[in-house]
């Protein structure tokens, strides 16, 4: 089968659109008064601060000193092949986490008093992520658990 120039152009534009699914980097993320931005109504977001079951995920918990736990989490996150660190503040990390086609935004907020790290992960594009953000946060939870306490 021989492709005509118009088909080649259409194919090239289609591939460009397919692989250019990063979307714009959100400018509304970050922590305000100990809170992360709420999830949108779409199911492609999870947050430990969400009140509805659709979006709710447990925060990361730790028993060791907050600074040690934070350093361990940072090591886990920075070591991920799919992660790019976007912002780092004391007790706050924001990363882009990539899949084959898409970019998701993940945030981590240290709550020293309660010995937890609040998490939020959301897809930039689309409506459903087929549970990808939740699975990824659970994977990070397992990696974050101290050695000997991993499930």
Feature-to-residue mapping (PLM):
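Bacterial N-terminal signal peptides that target proteins for export
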Residues: 1-10
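Ser/Thr-rich, low-complexity intrinsically disordered terminal regions
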Residues: 20-151
């Amino acid at each position: 089968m021989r492709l005509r120039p118009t088909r080649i152009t259409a194919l090239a534009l289609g591939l460009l659109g397919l692989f250019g699914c990063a979307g714009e980097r959100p400018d509304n993320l970050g922590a305000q008064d100990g809170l992360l931005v709420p999830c949108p109504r779409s199911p492609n977001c999870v947050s430990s601060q969400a009140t509805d079951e659709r979006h709710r995920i447990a925060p990361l918990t730790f028993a060791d000193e907050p600074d040690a736990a934070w350093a361990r989490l940072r090591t886990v996150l920075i070591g991920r092949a799919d992660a790019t660190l976007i912002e780092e503040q004391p007790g706050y990390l924001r990363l882009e986490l990539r899949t084959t086609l898409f970019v998701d935004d993940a945030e981590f907020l240290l709550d020293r008093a309660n010995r937890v790290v609040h998490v939020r992960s959301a897809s930039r594009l689309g409506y459903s992520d087929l549970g990808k953000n939740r699975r990824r946060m659970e994977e990070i939870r397992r990696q974050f658990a101290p050695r000997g306490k991993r499930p």
